[in-house]
Amino acid sequence: VYLLRLYSVYAYLTSLGLSVTLLFGVAGQVVIFMGALAGTSAYVAALSSLHLGLSPAVASALGILSGTSLGTGLVWLASRWDLRGIQVGILTLLASLAFEALILGNRAVTFGEVGFSVEDPLALMGLGASSALRVYAVAGMLLTSGLSLALLGMSGGRLWTLFRAAGEDPDLLRTNALDPVKYKAIAAAISSAIAGTAGILYAYSTGYVSPSAYSVVEADIPAYIVAAMGGLGNPVGALLGGVVVLAMRELTRSV
């Protein structure tokens, strides 16, 4: 059981690392909001099930849509304002802080810093706790490996090249009648959807949602370390980066 739960953490952090790999390592956007996007998706999914009675499938779709829309909108806005580098980082960091303030300031709805238990959709289907953990572990494995292979397949292709050009030399794209804002937004949409999916899967696999799991310290910083250890822009390397980060977390926790 411990190893299965550990793999849930690995899948979560590695997926966020893959999001950073695409949006920062390739598209050149310094973003500090992956945890907030994952948290937005997880909270929207969990709260809509709790307060509105939506089914887990509908709630999850709504959660992913919320996180994806938020991430895409912020990057699109930053690009329209021609913000670059640390300016984008500041904007997205403010969004992360706003997310945390929203969660902590609306305890009647979000239960504040304490968080709340999430109803496991697999338990509703009759699966036991250990069986559900195995399913989530397999889902996490498929998510991380599938995303890594998908991004690897994109690398070197036209869209990948346009993502990189949009981040490194947007003026060059404009001279070729291509809109860099469009390609930054597409990269943001893909990355945000990955983060949102990871956030929801993590919430269901742990059975709990709390703001600490989606904070800058617990999510964004490890995600950047995962991406950096994989060699920014290398999706396969991020899988190994996730192993290193998880090992470091466990070793420091035991000290």
Model-predicted segments: where are they?
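Transmembrane alpha-helices and adjacent helix-loop boundaries
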Residues: 1-255
